[in-house]
A protein has these predicted regions:
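Mid-domain alpha/beta scaffold segments of enzyme catalytic cores
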Residues: 1-240
Length: 240
């Protein structure tokens, strides 16, 4: 594979990568991954990825993951706005709705997500969205509140064919991860990936999560998580 790859979701501030950032990036470069989007999931990580993006000439996002929506306070909007004005920060997020485990209540998630939409409108930046087990609510919010759906990425899509069609009808972009490599959980994605237009499709690792379970390179086993995913494995997602 000669074309250089871009990993649109790397959680480089995760504890399992601490102190290894340059090694992770170097290994990715050797495996044809030229650029990364470093994702913020709360205020602290958003600050860190903005600095890392500047250091390594990548781009970053700033936002509150729905799991962390409960940590939103009266200062969060202005604090994020300040980060979003930095040169290397190019999207609002990771933000959205996750009703799978509800680490934050659905009501709080909805409210905080609407704040992120307001931030995207104020800064004219794209939205980087996380949605799990919340398709109907997410679709409704996007349809009612977002003006330019072409500036939305629904990352780590693992839903149904009907959900995918409805998202594409809105005009959003879709991100696919290593789930597509795994017959145990992602086989259904390969059955309808061809309906995603080339100009609406992104690939990502969402590392260190969602290992593609590749046979040629066994992911490193750590005490923190059973399978440590890395940006260097993006090539496996691209192959599938």
């Amino acid at each position: 594979m000669s074309n250089k790859l871009v990993d649109i979701c790397v959680n480089l501030t995760d504890d399992v990568f601490a102190g290894k950032e340059k090694n992770i990036i170097d290994a990715a470069n050797k495996n044809n991954v030229a650029k990364m989007v470093l994702v913020g999931n709360d205020l602290d990580s958003s600050l860190k990825v903005s600095s890392l993006a500047e250091q390594f000439s990548f781009v970053a996002t700033a936002g509150y993951h729905p799991h962390n929506a409960k940590d939103w306070n009266e200062k969060s909007y202005d604090s994020l706005l300040s980060i979003l004005k930095k040169n290397h920060v190019k999207a609002v997020g990771e933000c959205g709705l996750d009703f799978n485990r509800n680490f934050s209540t659905p009501e709080i998630q909805n409210s905080v997500f609407l704040n992120h939409i307001d931030l995207a409108k104020e800064t004219n930046l794209p939205l980087f969205i996380h949605e799990r087990d919340a398709f109907h609510q997410m679709h409704s919010i996007i349809k009612d509140n977002v003006i330019d759906c072409d500036k939305i990425v629904v990352h780590c899509f693992t839903g149904t064919k009907n959900a995918l069609i409805d998202y594409l009808d809105l005009g959003v972009h879709i991100g696919l991860t290593g789930w597509i490599c795994d017959d145990r959980r992602g086989k259904h994605l390969r059955d309808f990936i061809n309906i995603i237009p080339d100009d609406k499709l992104f690939i990502e690792t969402d590392s260190p999560y969602l290992s593609p379970y590749i046979s040629s390179k066994k992911p490193e086993v750590t005490s923190a998580m059973k399978h440590l995913n890395k940006p260097e494995y993006l090539v496996e997602v691209a192959k599938d």
